[in-house]
């Protein structure tokens, strides 16, 4: 790792990806049962080997080719040989790839658990959260750090005995914390099922040598005064924030979603904290309907280039205008505050005079033109190609939730056919992961040659 290269720095949603935290699908995903799907916030009953071998392994390969090619280029035949039993992809195995660019959280956890003091504190904390017996706590302390890290995440011992619930959402690593320039804002999950994730993330960020130089740059939100006295219906006054509701569009401009998982009070506290620390100059709060369909703002829009965005059409200018012109609908639904889009922008130098936007397209256009100095027409690619019912169906299966490997090159799911058509119609090349990996491995293509593409 270069001494000049910062470990932590994010000032764009579409800049060249250098490092990211990941977590491989663990055995806990295979323990999810229908009766606990709502409680554990994981509604898919997955076939574990399928999502590992036919989905996540391909994702890992692509990340390594783009971020850490020395670990994979020219070695894939041996890595994927049947005799090696996927050991390259298993975080607990000695043959695991252990990249310092594609960074596995389970390994970071195992490394900090080598410290006895941390091991004692974490075992006590996890057992308190999960209401375990003292005997269980002692049993955990007898485990090797690698095995203990795995159990903290999966909830299961090597013997396959379950001690407590899995945390299947740990694979969504964006939610555990947000990098804003050279700062890390830790999350405060809205649901109890994600409390253990937040605890693990906190211990890693505050204790792993990888983040040692950034201890003063780790930010946490505090619960409000007498928060424990708030009635359940006062949800907006509670402080909950998840990473899917925060986007760093430029070094000076942050977007915060107020959603099913992130509260207005959390947005308020984040604005105060970031402005006081001079971390950004402008923050836009995007209040979306509190619906499971949307969950976070990154499920309804994502930036794919400085001048291009993918989004759900119901928040477009045309759709919002039609809704506002329908006087009957407006009269009937006027009181449904939680079902309306609201966008307010605050500037540190003029915080008393916030600016409002009527629709998402106007905000995103301003970001591209004013913040990012784009002079041409701003492109909007719509979920499901803006066709009913495909727009809603494909948004549910993450058509708007993409990962930019570099500007104009994004990773998405192959199941969203209509959205893929929309990308193609807007000049993007559609690349299938299997074919792209083959070309990268044989040398007929390199990552620098890939321009505008949906993978």
What are these regions (language model features)?
Residues 2-452:
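The feature marks the mature, well-folded catalytic cores of soluble enzymes
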């Amino acid at each position: 790792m270069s001494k000049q290269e910062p470990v932590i720095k994010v000032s764009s949603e579409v800049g060249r990806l250098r490092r990211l935290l990941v977590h491989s699908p663990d055995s806990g995903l295979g323990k999810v049962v229908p009766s606990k799907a709502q409680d554990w916030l994981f509604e898919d009953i997955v076939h574990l080997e399928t999502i590992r071998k036919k989905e996540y392994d391909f994702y890992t390969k692509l990340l390594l080719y783009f971020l850490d090619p020395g670990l994979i280029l020219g070695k894939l035949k041996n890595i994927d040989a049947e005799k090696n039993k996927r050991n390259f992809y298993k975080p607990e195995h000695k043959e695991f790839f252990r990249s310092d660019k594609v960074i596995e959280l389970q390994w970071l956890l195992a490394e900090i658990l080598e410290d006895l003091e941390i091991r004692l504190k974490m075992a006590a904390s996890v057992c308190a959260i999960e209401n375990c017996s003292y005997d269980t706590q002692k049993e955990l302390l007898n485990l090797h750090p690698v095995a203990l890290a795995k159990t903290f995440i999966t909830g299961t011992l090597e013997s396959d005995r379950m001690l407590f619930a899995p945390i299947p959402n740990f694979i969504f690593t964006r939610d555990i914390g947000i990098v804003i320039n050279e700062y890390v804002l830790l999350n405060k999950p809205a649901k109890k099922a994600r409390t253990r994730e937040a605890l693990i993330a906190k211990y890693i960020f505050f204790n792993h040598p990888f983040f040692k130089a950034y201890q003063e740059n780790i930010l946490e939100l505090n619960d409000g005064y007498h928060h424990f006295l708030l009635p359940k219906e006062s949800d907006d006054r509670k402080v909950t924030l998840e990473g899917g509701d925060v986007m760093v569009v430029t070094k000076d401009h942050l977007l915060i979603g107020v959603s099913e998982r992130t509260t207005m009070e959390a947005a308020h506290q984040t604005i105060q904290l970031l402005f006081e620390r001079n971390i950004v100059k402008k923050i836009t709060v995007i209040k979306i309907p509190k619906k499971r369909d949307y969950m976070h703002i990154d499920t309804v829009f994502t930036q794919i280039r400085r001048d291009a965005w993918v989004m759900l059409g119901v928040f477009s200018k045309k759709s919002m205008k039609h809704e506002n012109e329908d006087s009957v609908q407006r009269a009937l639904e006027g009181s449904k505050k939680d079902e309306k889009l609201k966008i307010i922008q605050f500037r540190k130098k003029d915080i008393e005079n916030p600016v409002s936007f009527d629709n998402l397209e106007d905000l995103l256009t301003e970001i591209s033109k004013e913040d990012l100095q784009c002079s041409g027409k701003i492109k909007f690619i719509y979920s499901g190609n803006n066709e009913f019912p495909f727009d809603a169906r494909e948004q549910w299966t993450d058509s708007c939730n993409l990962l930019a490997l570099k500007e104009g090159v994004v990773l998405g799911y192959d199941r969203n056919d209509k959205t893929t058509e929309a990308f193609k119609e807007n000049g993007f090349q559609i690349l299938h992961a299997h074919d792209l990996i083959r070309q990268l491995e044989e040398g007929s293509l390199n990552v620098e040659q890939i321009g505008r593409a949906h993978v």
